[in-house]
Amino acid sequence: MAGTLYIVATPIGNLEDMPPRVAATFGAADFIAAEDTRVTMKLLNFLGLKKPMVSYYEHALQKGEGILRRIETGENCALCSDAGMPCVSDPGEVIVRDALARGIKVVPVPAASACVTALAVSGQDTSRWVFEGFLPVNRKQKKERLAELLGEKRTVIFYEAPHKLRTTLDDLTAAFGEDRSITLCRELTKLHEEIWKTTLGEAVAHYAANEPRGEYVLVM
């Protein structure tokens, strides 16, 4: 009898936000499929658990095949990303797609999501929204994606890394104008958490003089 693939959310920053069901699922799993085994090892140490792990981040198609074969032989797998809900802007989505196609039972074990957490505290319209995840790395492709969003009336949510924030703010300003409202949510649930609602023009000016630090969720 085949096992089960559990899609397990982990805290987005503060380990005290760990739901009991998440810890129990890790404890009951035969093995863990992790985005980065080093990050997940810290989580397991916090929980006092030892489990065999495999990383799925690189070559998700090939790694996924091995993971799914183990589940088909009866093992239960807990799949997690470094933080938040896996398989959203994450290569784990390929594994879930293939698991469903092969008739493997997939069970969500939800917890915090940086996207929804940022939206809730953004002060922007939360009635209708769209999640864009990370914008393309290629500058031309990024500008094309932003051009597609020019007519978007829903609140738009992006993820961004600190080393790319300045360029992204410049591109957003060029596309939407410096008066466009934006909320920058930095290091959510962590020690240096910051939620700043401002305009694109003010954000560009601020980060021209200040180094971006930490992971960002942009809500505009």
Protein language model features and the residues they cover:
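Glycine-rich, flexible N-terminal cofactor/catalytic loop recognition
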Residues: 1-58
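A contiguous loop/helix-start segment that scaffolds small-molecule binding in enzyme catalytic cores
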Residues: 2, 155, 159-220
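Short glycine-rich anion-binding loops that position phosphate/pyrophosphate groups of nucleotides
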Residues: 12-15, 82-86, 162-164, 188
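Short active-site oxyanion
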Residues: 26-32, 103-107, 155-156
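Conserved helicase motor
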Residues: 54-62, 134-139
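Glycine/small-residue-rich loop that forms an oxyanion/phosphate-binding "nest" at active or ligand-binding sites
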Residues: 64-113
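Class I SAM-dependent methyltransferase SAM-binding "motif I" and its flanking Rossmann-like core
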Residues: 94-152
